[in-house]
Design a protein with these regions (language model features):
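C-terminal nuclease/phosphodiesterase catalytic domains that cleave nucleic-acid phosphodiester bonds
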Residues: 47, 206, 333-337, 451-558
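Generic beta-strand/beta-sheet core signal
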Residues: 87, 133, 171, 179-181, ...
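Gly/Thr-rich phosphate-binding beta-strand-loop-beta motif of the actin/hexokinase/Hsp70
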Residues: 362-389
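Mg2+-dependent endonuclease catalytic cores in nucleic-acid-processing enzymes, primarily RNase H-like
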Residues: 5, 11-27, 238-250, 258-259, ...
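Phosphate/NTP-binding elements of NTP-utilizing enzymes
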Residues: 1-372, 425, 502
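A glycine-rich phosphate-binding loop feature that marks nucleotide/adenosyl-phosphate handling sites
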Residues: 164-166, 229-235, 266, 434-439, ...
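Short acidic-glycine loop/turn motifs at beta-strand connectors
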Residues: 170-172, 387-391, 484-485
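Conserved luminal/periplasmic juxtamembrane motif of membrane-embedded glycan-processing enzymes
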Residues: 200, 279, 345, 353, ...
Length: 558
């Protein structure tokens, strides 16, 4: 897939469906079976409800673009994606789309045949076996109740369809079956397409985890990519460990370089991070400010609904403003936003709101401060720069020990620090000492004279967090305030984002101050790049207010 020449996308757009090229054209794969699949849907399926009930089924443009990626293939006809997640707000039309896809998988041209005149051509799949899996009968009922209305007379007659409450048969021997809360019913089966319905409710307590594991195993066992699985969900509730949350975490891990992409399509459309909800009540006495905030909420809902124009924006806004509905649930259901867990430090939407799409890249000679946090084998090691001019954060390098035989390559880390000092005008550096003390001492000796600001009286770059807990807690507080006030910016680096949102608050012995840490000591959700960002930003703040800052304009943040 050619990803060159793409426009940058804001954080609320995840996946390829809403991406565009610099030419203004939609970003689409070179080869896809979607054209044949959608033409088949138009010929054989009918709209199940609404003003167009009974007319030929036509997906929205947004749904069509999603289908182009789900059915994208390479030159040899192999699907680009083995599994996927489609996350949209409540009422977007996920069930009708999945019902249409299930019927197409049963009898339509969903298997690659050949390339003709530069276009991939599809053919019906032999022995089609579709499973609609859920953790409750109500969930599968949502999909199966659509089949009688969607299957046209032509479809029933030409393909010999028999539609029952939880089973659909075709004359060719294909079947669509409902599977609920029964991992044993899935074990060892060889389906060709599996729908995981409403995975935000798939929990360990209702066998959701086990079912997802069995489905994943069936997909892995299928020869030549003959089986694929697609999850549909609303935004999940963080901390519940639902399958939807696990899928989201897997996507973030891939983006951050913590995991290998094995063919996962994750597609979501959220309201922008700065869409106000709880803020509206505080503005009630200021009519002008309230109206402006209400317009931003309206715009956020319009963005999140995508092409689902049947969703009434006024009705959704009324539900959001109903004080009986928790703000977190309104954001989850109607804005499709993933909220923060209760003890999290910075919410994803708070961090995303600080991303600047037109941010000037870090360039040679830029005046910066550096933050460093090192580890030998258990945690990551990272080096982050904060540009003095505009408080922009950049991850210079990050090392995952698992990618280096279980141990961070120290000489590589040293070379990166040397390169940073050679490339940029480094005015201050804060480096945690633990597990990298010898190198921190070396950097202090080698570069100390160049620094405008000294981190420690004995070593200009040394910042031992074991002995400076209060200083670090103050820096954490200042960093959080800057994020909330959007006076710190970043380029959307996926590693830094993941580490920022992984960090949780930890109490200290200093009045109301808190520090940050991992969720648990052995948690795999790392925060090292976040620590570096705090150190770099703290050094920047100290520098711009010091007497050492002379002669060059900067934005002073308070």
């Amino acid at each position: 897939v050619d990803e060159s020449g793409l426009l940058p996308v804001p954080p609320h757009v995840i996946g390829p469906t809403w991406r565009k090229r610099t030419s203004g054209e939609w970003y689409l794969p070179e080869y896809t079976l979607a054209d044949d699949v959608v033409n088949w849907m138009f010929a054989y399926l009918t709209q199940p409800s609404g003003p167009r009930a009974g007319e030929p089924f036509i997906p929205t443009f947004e749904q069509f673009r999603f289908l182009t990626w789900w059915y994208a293939v390479d030159e040899s006809g192999r699907f680009l994606y083995r599994n996927g997640t489609l996350r949209r707000l409540k009422g977007w039309g996920k069930d009708p789309l999945l019902a249409a896809m299930s019927l197409a998988e049963l009898s339509g041209p969903v298997a690659f045949s050949h390339v003709e005149k530069g276009k991939a051509v599809g053919t019906p799949r032999a022995s089609a076996w579709i499973q609609v899996a859920a953790v409750s009968q109500d969930q599968t009922r949502n999909t199966f109740s659509l089949f009688p209305a969607m299957a046209s007379r032509r479809l029933r007659e030409e393909y010999g369809l028999e539609i029952h409450r939880t089973l659909v048969y075709s004359e060719a021997g294909g079947v669509i079956e409902a599977v609920t809360s029964s991992p044993l019913a899935l074990e060892g089966k060889r389906p060709t397409f599996v729908v995981l319905n409403e995975t935000q409710w798939w929990l360990e307590s209702n066998a959701g985890h086990e079912m997802a594991g069995v489905i994943s195993g069936n997909v892995d066992k299928a020869a030549y990519g003959a089986c694929r699985s697609l999850s549909i969900c609303n935004a999940h509730r963080p901390g519940e460990e639902s399958v939807a949350e696990r899928d989201y975490e897997a996507y973030l891990a891939i983006q951050a370089g913590e995991a290998v992409d094995n063919g996962m399509l994750y597609d979501s459309l959220e309201a922008p991070a700065d869409t106000p909800v709880s803020e509206l009540a505080a503005l009630a006495e200021d009519p002008e400010a309230y109206a402006e905030a209400l317009n931003r909420l309206r715009r956020g809902v319009e963005i999140a609904r995508g092409d689902a124009e049947w969703l009434d924006v006024d009705t959704i806004i009324s539900s959001i403003l109903d004080i009986r509905n928790p703000v977190t649930e309104s954001r989850r259901k109607f804005l499709n936003q993933v909220n923060a867990v209760e003890d999290s430090w910075i919410a994803p939407r708070e961090w995303d709101a600080c991303r600047e799409l037109s941010l000037r890249p870090l360039e040679k000679g830029d005046r910066v401060t550096l933050g460093f946090d090192g580890s030998k084998s258990n945690d990551w090691t990272a080096l982050v720069a904060c540009r003095v001019e505009d408080s922009a954060l950049f991850v210079l390098r990050a090392w995952n020990p698992e990618r280096h035989g279980g141990e961070v390559p120290r000489e590589d880390v040293h070379a990166a620090v040397v390169s940073a000092f050679a490339t940029y005008d480094v005015v201050a550096m804060r480096a945690d000492v633990k597990e990298f003390e010898a190198y921190v001492d070396l950097w202090g000796e080698r570069f100390g004279r160049k620094l405008k600001l000294k981190s420690d009286a004995k070593n200009p770059v040394r910042f031992d967090m074991r002995g400076r807990k209060k200083d670090f807690a103050l820096a954490v507080e200042a960093f959080y305030d800057a994020v909330v006030e959007r006076t710190v910016v970043h380029d959307g680096n996926p590693i830094l984002r993941r580490h920022i949102v992984n960090a949780v608050r930890r109490p200290t012995n200093y009045e109301d101050l808190y520090t940050i840490g991992k969720a648990t000591k052995d948690s795999k959700r790392k925060i090292d790049a976040a620590v570096c960002a705090v150190l770099a930003f703290g050094a920047r703040q100290e520098f711009v207010t010091s007497k050492k800052n002379r002669g060059r304009g900067v934005v002073i943040l308070k």
